[in-house]
A protein has these predicted regions:
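Hydrophobic transmembrane alpha-helices of multi-pass solute/ion transporters
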Residues: 1-8, 144-155, 160-227, 240-244, ...
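Hydrophobic alpha-helical transmembrane segments of multi-pass integral membrane proteins
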Residues: 5-37, 245-287, 310-311
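Hydrophobic core segments of alpha-helical transmembrane domains in multi-pass membrane transport
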Residues: 13-21, 96-110, 158-172, 181-191, ...
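Inter-helical loop and helix-membrane interface segments of multi-pass membrane transporters/permeases
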Residues: 1-8, 46-52, 113-153, 194-209, ...
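Alpha-helical transmembrane segments of multi-pass membrane proteins
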Residues: 7-19, 46-62, 254-267, 293-323, ...
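Juxtamembrane helix-boundary/capping and inter-helix hinge elements in multi-pass membrane proteins
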Residues: 46-50, 75-88, 234-237, 249-251, ...
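Short helix-coil transition sites and intra-membrane helix breaks within transmembrane domains
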Residues: 20-33, 61-70, 216-218, 229-240, ...
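Juxtamembrane and boundary regions of transmembrane helices in multi-pass small-molecule transporters
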Residues: 65-68, 77-143, 276, 317-402
């Protein structure tokens, strides 16, 4: 209702998809729902199609990295044996900082491109979507059609309250299930007033389908992790790789940095962020558990970082890999809903500010130790944590001197 112009459509799309992805816990569904709106709105306004496309792609990944009901968040936390809520609390400041920095850069790029400043609104953009695009959206993500209709008709601003309640409850340290319960109850109450909820039965049906869609994937991946991890452990299949990483790591911080690069490498090799999480996750966990000495609290913080590596470098790292299934899905959706442009993988990659900021900052902060300036995000410093081979070397030197 406020209207956007060509200079703000990309950053607005970025922020809207980021918020929506946290609420839904899915980047794919968020992208499928928002791409038609912002691509056609961008078309009407005369904005940059590539910047807008990459911005909504990056924003849609935000919830998959920090959402309480995101499958990548849940699975990566489970593999590292950390609580989802603790995981989110440890990285929320860094994640939001990446969001803010990316939004500023995207808006700066829009200004640098000298884009027009005429104003339009989303209702006009939705009316401009051709019939063929509607059919493609319904085939890929049927729920996105309902969301588009709600956006066209208008949804009251107070419907953001359930999302805010979930975030506040999580920050206060409430259990994950209680956070979700608050969000579900408030959504039903406010949705009844807003007209987005028809009845209790239909609402419970939506909740059930949402949990079953997300939960089924989590269960399958955790079963795969259990079977795959057990077999690989008995075969010592990861031992050569683990020994190599230990050999080139001079301290714990370097070990964690290489864990991050290992996640990116696994993501590129497997072309699937979930496959990377369940394949590389056990390796990074074992590297920390078997080779780092420290208090239980400090080791737990290292596991939290490993979990962040798995999902953040899995989801956002996928945005920088041309052959990744994420990019393939995005290109397929884009080609269906906006046939006026021929999209290729590099279109999404080169303008995806959020992906570059998130991946780059996570690795840089880990390696340099600058993560200590971010609340709850800093890794324990030496001598609180040490590599076990360093401890053995020190003990050997003491014995020789004696």
């Amino acid at each position: 209702s406020l209207g956007v112009n060509a200079r703000t459509v990309a950053v607005c799309g970025f922020l809207v998809t980021a918020i929506l992805s946290v609420a839904t816990g899915t980047s794919w569904g968020t992208f499928a729902a928002c791409a038609p709106i912002f691509l056609w709105l961008n078309h009407i306004l005369g904005g940059s199609i590539l910047l807008t496309t990459a911005s909504i792609a990056g924003g849609a990944c935000f919830g998959d990295n920090i959402g309480l009901i995101s499958d990548t968040t849940v699975v990566s936390s489970g593999i590292q044996k950390v609580e989802v809520l603790e995981r989110v609390k440890s990285q929320v400041v860094w994640s939001v900082a990446c969001l803010v920095v990316s939004a500023i850069i995207i808006y700066g790029m829009s200004i640098a491109m000298q884009l027009p400043t005429e104003v339009a609104n989303t209702a006009i953009a939705i009316d401009s979507i051709p019939t063929e695009a509607w059919s493609a959206i319904e085939a890929q993500k049927p729920a996105a059609v309902e969301l588009l209709n709600q956006v066209k008709e208008g949804v009251p601003f107070y419907m953001v309250i359930p999302l805010l309640l979930v975030i506040i409850a999580a920050v206060l340290g409430m259990p994950t299930l209680l956070c979700l319960f608050l969000g579900i109850c408030s959504s039903f109450i406010l949705g009844s007033f807003a007209g987005t909820v028809e009845s209790l039965g239909s609402f419970l049906g939506l909740v059930e389908s949402g949990f079953s869609e997300a939960g089924s994937w989590v269960i399958v991946m955790m079963m795969w992790f259990g079977a795959f991890g057990g077999i690989m452990s008995k075969m010592n299949a990861f031992e050569p790789l683990s020994k190599f990483i230990l050999k080139i790591s001079r301290n714990v911080r370097q070990l964690m940095f290489w864990n991050g690069l290992l996640c990116i490498g696994g993501n590129a090799a497997l072309s699937d962020e979930m496959a990377q999480i369940v394949t590389i996750g056990p390796i990074t966990k074992e590297l920390v558990d078997k080779n780092v000495e420290g208090s239980e609290e400090d080791i737990y913080k290292l596991r939290l970082r490993n979990a962040t590596f798995s999902s953040a470098l899995g989801v956002f790292g996928s945005q920088l890999i041309p052959w990744h299934v994420y990019i393939g899905f995005y290109v397929g959706i884009l080609s269906s809903v906006y046939p006026l442009h021929t999209f290729i993988a590099t279109d999404i990659i080169k303008y995806n500010v959020m992906a570059f900021v998130t991946v780059g900052s996570l690795l840089l902060l880990t390696l340099t130790g600058w993560d200590r300036f971010i609340p709850n995000f800093g890794l324990p410093r030496e001598p609180k944590v040490k590599l076990k081979n360093q401890t053995s070397d020190v003990n050997s030197d003491k014995e020789i001197c004696a």
